[in-house]
Design a protein with these regions (language model features):
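Conserved phosphate- and dinucleotide-binding cores of soluble alpha/beta proteins
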Residues: 2-25, 30-33, 45, 77, ...
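HTH-adjacent hinge/linker in prokaryotic transcriptional regulators
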Residues: 2-7, 11-23, 27-99, 107-127, ...
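Active-site metal-binding loops of divalent metal-dependent hydrolases
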Residues: 100-101, 217
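Short Gly/Thr/Asp-enriched flexible loops that form oxyanion-binding sites at enzyme active sites
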Residues: 102-115, 188-199
Length: 258
């Protein structure tokens, strides 16, 4: 288990329990207490938890591991999911993409797809996004037209949120909205950790002809703080081959296993 995977597991345990002792965390993750103490100290320095004598408590209900750390988790699954999701995009499409590790991989897959190329100076696809990192990577690609929302930048996810971000989606129509999520549950729908992110993701879904959730199996059956949309509003789920997706298929969601 890498350090970033361990950090994510520690934060998940804190989210569910509220507090952890060093000994409890070491037993849960089968690592030494010295390793856990270092992890707690480093996470406390980043204000992602509060250090206590002998352990730690959750800093806030809605925290999330920064994108730069989450990108190391389940990387191969996310790349396969992204490649399969990218195949859903036809030349000339206008798509919405939110922030996240899987959607970042999707953007990279679209950037390198051989059949998408600019003709007579016109881009092959248009991507509307609120993710600064995705816009930064794709703005140099001549076959991609990038529309970046305004808004307030979140340091954890590099996403722009707020009225300025939502306002852009009021003015556009999308063929597909690609959503990365923190949790996807048949009863509770698609969720994320931040209510402002949920708001703009919801608006993106409303403006799209089709809604595609790209999520690895660790997100299925999970829920986070803020609801994005119900399962009935999701057309396609792209996930990894090991995922148990029967409940989603029974709910009418088309599933693509990558």
């Amino acid at each position: 288990m890498s350090r970033y995977e361990r950090w994510n597991d520690l934060l998940s345990l804190l989210a569910s329990r509220g507090r952890l002792s060093v000994e409890e965390a070491a037993a849960e993750l089968t690592v030494s207490t010295a390793t856990i103490r270092r992890d707690f100290d480093q996470l406390a320095q980043q204000q992602m938890l509060t250090r206590t004598r002998g352990g730690a408590v959750a800093h806030t209900v809605t925290y999330d591991l920064p994108l730069r750390y989450k990108s190391a988790r389940r990387a191969s699954e996310k790349q396969r999911i992204a490649a399969a999701a990218a195949e859903l995009v036809q030349p000339g499409a206008v798509i919405g993409v939110n922030g996240g590790t899987t959607t970042t991989e999707l953007a990279r897959a679209l950037a390198t797809r051989a059949d998408l190329h600019a003709e007579n100076g016109s881009p092959a696809i248009t991507i509307v996004t609120n993710a600064l990192n995705i816009a930064n990577e794709l703005v140099v690609r001549p076959h991609v037209k990038i529309v970046l929302t305004g808004g307030v930048a979140l340091p954890q996810s590099y996403e722009l949120v707020g009225p300025l971000a939502n306002g852009v989606f009021d003015q556009v129509t999308l063929d597909i909205a690609f959503l990365g999520v923190s949790g996807l549950d048949v009863e509770r729908g698609a969720t994320c950790h931040n209510e402002d992110e949920a708001s703009i993701n919801r608006q993106m879904a409303i403006r799209a002809e089709r809604v595609v959730v790209a999520a690895d199996s660790s997100k299925l059956g999970e829920r986070a703080f803020a609801k994005i949309c119900g399962v009935g509003e999701i057309d396609i789920l792209v996930t990894d081959a090991s995922a148990d997706t029967r409940s989603f298929e029974e709910a009418g969601v088309k599933v693509v296993h990558a």
